[in-house]
């Protein structure tokens, strides 16, 4: 799998990603997204659904809980998130932490402990009501390089985008491995884009949240991982022109193969 070779994560994670087999014997009927604004901005669940439909597959029921800025631990106390999990009968459940949470976890033991324990508890609760659910951890992306030029940068998320992405990859990989879940490498595709000769601006002006083109890229990767499609090329591309859509499809294919 290219992601493990290209980005050279720790050896155990490389083996995990290389050997992870397709997890879905049939198309899922019910998909749940639990996250925050990185899922909610541009309505990723709806974009994912459009990508699925335009591929000619039966559209699943898709629901979500995406209150802004929430950590995995906070979702355990959010009635809306817990109600959806307890509804049960989910085929796929996507879990996404606060955008800086896994990066801060690298250097902050308390944040790391909370992240690991909360991920495990969410998985436990999902499986209590949906025993056959495939759980996906949504690897998000580093801040835009301009974030590090600001006078006030906030908590320690790494010295630059490369270090921040490495932290996100590592800790989402850890919780995926520890909880027998799927790792969805959206952030790695963003990194490929920004390392390319003519990168597309995927971040909004806040250097954090996704433009629609970034959300489209994420949706392609979710489609590819959940449906075991190595080269996602849906007919639907929303507001993107054909050239942009094909470019994003290429980045998605690189992390899916």
What does each of the following model-derived ranges do?
Residues 179, 202-257:
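Conserved catalytic region of serine esterases and O-acyltransferases that act on ester linkages
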Residues 1-8:
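N-terminal secretory signal peptides that target proteins for export/translocation
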Residues 28-32, 38-122, 131:
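Conserved SGNH/GDSL esterase-like catalytic core that processes O-acyl groups on lipids
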């Amino acid at each position: 799998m290219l992601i493990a070779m290209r980005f050279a994560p720790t050896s155990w994670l490389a083996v995990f990603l290389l050997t992870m087999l397709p997890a879905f014997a049939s198309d899922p009927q019910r998909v749940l997204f639990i996250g925050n604004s990185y899922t909610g901005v541009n309505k990723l669940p709806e974009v994912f659904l459009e990508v699925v439909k335009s591929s000619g597959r039966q559209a699943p029921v898709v629901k979500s809980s995406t209150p802004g800025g929430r950590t995995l631990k906070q979702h355990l106390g959010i009635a809306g998130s817990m109600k959806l999990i307890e509804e049960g009968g989910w085929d796929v459940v996507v879990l996404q932490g606060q955008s800086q949470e896994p990066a801060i976890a690298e250097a902050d033991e308390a944040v790391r402990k909370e992240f690991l324990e909360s991920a495990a508890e969410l998985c436990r609760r999902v499986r209590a009501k949906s025993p056959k659910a495939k759980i996906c951890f949504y690897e998000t992306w580093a801040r835009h390089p301009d974030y590090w030029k600001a006078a006030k940068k906030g908590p320690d998320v790494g010295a630059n985008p490369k270090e921040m992405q490495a932290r996100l990859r590592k800790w989402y990989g850890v919780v995926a491995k520890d909880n027998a879940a799927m790792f969805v490498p959206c952030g790695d595709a963003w990194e490929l884009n920004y390392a390319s000769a003519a990168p597309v601006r995927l971040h909004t002006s806040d250097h954090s949240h996704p433009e629609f083109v970034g959300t489209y890229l994420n949706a392609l990767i979710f489609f590819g991982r959940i449906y075991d499609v190595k080269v996602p090329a849906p007919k639907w591309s929303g507001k993107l022109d054909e050239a942009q859509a094909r470019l994003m499809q290429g980045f998605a294919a690189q992390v899916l193969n």
